[in-house]
């Protein structure tokens, strides 16, 4: 498949190909996602938001270990799959999956204790606008964890510049601090790990 097609499906999975892409993303990024969830330091009474949940690899853990999980994804295909897979939790009022973007999160201010996003910042028009929305929906003292491959790695993949905007750790840190997150730090399981998880407190 050409890089532009892969990039388009990564940013907005659609139809049968989108479902396959979701499965591939889950398989390829399993360790990265598990590490991001670990950095959330989940508690049983937490209300958690995941932006761009894609194939939904984190959702079983979030649903099982917290009081409420919300997910926002721009892909109607991924939202429909999550609603079907977690129909019991949705009916019980413990989960809510919506189509949307980080620039306009469909939730009230202070609605969540924790929030995460993995491999989505390449597609955001503005880091500051996205993080400002995450800051808005997090309660004071809440935590955000942002997982991504840094620009130095992404540049080697040759993804189309009109669909991907690679980000440096410094850019992500600066944007989080600009909208009011504190204690912002980069963490990785080992110094040789390619991807980063940036953690900030509201």
Predicted regions and their residues:
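Core SAM-dependent methyltransferase catalytic element
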Residues: 188-202
């Amino acid at each position: 498949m050409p890089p532009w097609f892969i990039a388009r499906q990564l940013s907005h999975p659609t139809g049968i190909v989108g479902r396959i892409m979701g499965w591939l993303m889950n398989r390829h990024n399993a360790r990265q996602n598990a590490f991001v969830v670990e950095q959330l330091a989940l508690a049983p009474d937490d209300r958690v938001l995941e932006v761009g949940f894609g194939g939904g690899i984190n959702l079983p853990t979030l649903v099982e270990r917290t009081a409420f999980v919300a997910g926002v994804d721009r892909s109607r295909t991924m939202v429909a799959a999550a609603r079907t897979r977690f129909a019991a939790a949705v009916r019980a009022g413990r989960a809510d999956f919506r189509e949307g973007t980080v620039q306009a999160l469909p939730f009230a201010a202070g609605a969540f204790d924790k929030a995460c996003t993995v491999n989505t910042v390449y597609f955001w028009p503005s880091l500051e606008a996205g993080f400002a929305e995450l800051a808005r929906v997090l309660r004071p003292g809440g935590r955000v964890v942002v997982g991504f491959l840094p620009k130095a790695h992404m540049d080697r993949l040759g993804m189309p510049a009109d669909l991907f905007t690679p980000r440096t750790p410094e850019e992500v840190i600066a944007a989080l601090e600009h909208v009011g997150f504190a204690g912002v730090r980069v963490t990785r399981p080992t110094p040789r790990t390619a991807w980063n998880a940036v953690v900030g407190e509201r």
